[in-house]
Amino acid sequence: MATEKTLDDLFLDTLKDIYFAEKQILKALPKMARAAQSEEGKQGFLHHRDETQGQIERLEEVFELLGKNARGKTCEAIQGIIAEAEEIMDEFKGTAALDAGLISSAQAVEHYEIARYGTLIAWARQIGLDKAVPLLQANLDEEAATDKKLTKLAETAANPKAKKAA
């Protein structure tokens, strides 16, 4: 018979998931920056790469609070989102719609991360892991801010540029 799993186990499992996801995102962001056509898009992806490194470090602190080694668990969701981004980079390379596609991929990543961090914060509170909350909240706040920046970039530059080319 399987051993009973608890919210603590689910928290650790989800922490491993987002840790893996952040590491994959860290690898994908330079490719997205190189593919972006606008300078603002390139700089945005590079800035988020630097933020992502800080987010990984905060996640490592949460692992330390748990007395566990920082270790990821394959996150198929993020692998799928990154694969879609790579598809967009291939299919729309050199077109006016590329940046709009890259932004939409980046926002899919952000929304996944926002969902994960929100859940982890709620669970950390529930299991009494109060010292993890500010670390996770800092990551959530950065993800939400990035999502807002991406929306602004899409609405003011990338989407109109993609539409004009039609």
Q: How would you name each of these model-derived features?
A:
Residues M1-A166:
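Amphipathic alpha-helical hairpins
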